Amino acid sequence: MTINYQFGDVDAHGAMIRAQAGSLEAEHQAIISDVLTASDFWGGAGSAACQGFITQLGRNFQVIYEQANAHGQKVQAAGNNMAQTDSAVGSSWA
């Protein structure tokens, strides 16, 4: 009986998570553009309130990026560890 695991799928999933984290920058910039378009709400683009909102938004996106990227790395590492363990166990049974 042969059991086949698709460790490449796990690695690809981790890579996808990391790619999605990377694409957050485009979303961040689009939101900043919308905020600046509606900057009158905060008293103008140069106002402390508007700039404070943009700064906080940037911090939030940075945290999300870092967490998503780290999670993707962990998924890839787990897939790699499983593949190595499977290979070691499989070769010991041969």
Swiss-Prot record:
Q: What are the TM regions of this chain, as residue ranges?
A: none
Provide the alphabetized UniProt keywords.
Secreted, Virulence
Main function: Probable virulence factor. In mice, elicits increased levels of IFN-gamma, IL-12 and IgG(2a), indicating a dominant Th1 host immune response.
Spell out the family assignment given in the record's similarity comment.
Belongs to the WXG100 family. ESAT-6 subfamily.
Gene name as annotated: esxV
* Subcellular compartments: Secreted
- GO (cellular component) term, any one: peptidoglycan-based cell wall
Could you give the subunit structure recorded for this chain?
A: Forms a tight 1:1 complex with EsxW. The complex is destabilized at low pH. Unfolding of the proteins is required for dissociation of the complex and membrane binding.
Name by which UniProt lists this protein: ESAT-6-like protein EsxV
Q: Which organism is it from?
A: Mycobacterium tuberculosis (strain ATCC 25618 / H37Rv)
Under the heading InterPro entries, the entry gives: ESAT-6-like_Myco (IPR009416), ESAT-6-like_sf (IPR036689), T7SS_ESAT-6-like (IPR010310)
Q: What else is known?
A: Potent T-cell antigen that could be a subunit vaccine candidate.
